[in-house]
Amino acid sequence: MLSPKRTKFRKAHKGRIHGTAKGNTQLNFGQFGLKALEPERITARQIESARRAITRQMKRAGRVWIRIFPDLPVSTKPAEVRMGSGKGAPEYWVARVQPGRIMFEIDGVAEGIAREALKLGAAKLPIKTKIVTRIGEA
């Protein structure tokens, strides 16, 4: 699963996801992509699950680019622990995704296979998405 090799700080604030994506809204690598339509935190496990679904559907032909990276640590406290006594330990990593952000790109496969693969990948994610192409949006 994806996670940073090292970070400046061990823990981070929860924060909010405001507005739409400023960059990474266009396809840069592949012919087809998966664009986010809602703001959400996507976990490293969800990214990996979507990646596996996409690659399996493509029968390992073509190429997949993951355009988001989980760089935000999420900390949790153990079950049945009283309030207070500090923030919990970092448990997993998430990527903040804004609407309009391209999350996955694929190339080297036919359009029908690409659409099916991205549809299966989108089913693994907790947000509404849209399949985009170089020619236009679909």
Swiss-Prot record:
InterPro entries: Ribosomal_uL16, Ribosomal_uL16_bact-type, Ribosomal_uL16_CS, Ribosomal_uL16_dom, Ribosomal_uL16_sf. Transmembrane segments: none annotated. Keywords: Ribonucleoprotein, Ribosomal protein, RNA-binding, rRNA-binding, tRNA-binding. The keyword Ribonucleoprotein applies. GO terms for molecular function: rRNA binding; structural constituent of ribosome; tRNA binding. One of its GO terms (cellular component) is cytosolic large ribosomal subunit. It holds the Pfam family Ribosomal_L16. GO terms for biological process: translation. It comes from the Bacteria. Part of the 50S ribosomal subunit. Binds 23S rRNA and is also seen to make contacts with the A and possibly P site tRNAs. PANTHER family: 50S/60S RIBOSOMAL PROTEIN L16, LARGE RIBOSOMAL SUBUNIT PROTEIN UL16M. Belongs to the universal ribosomal protein uL16 family. This is Large ribosomal subunit protein uL16. The lineage of its organism: Bacteria, Pseudomonadati, Pseudomonadota, Alphaproteobacteria, Acetobacterales.
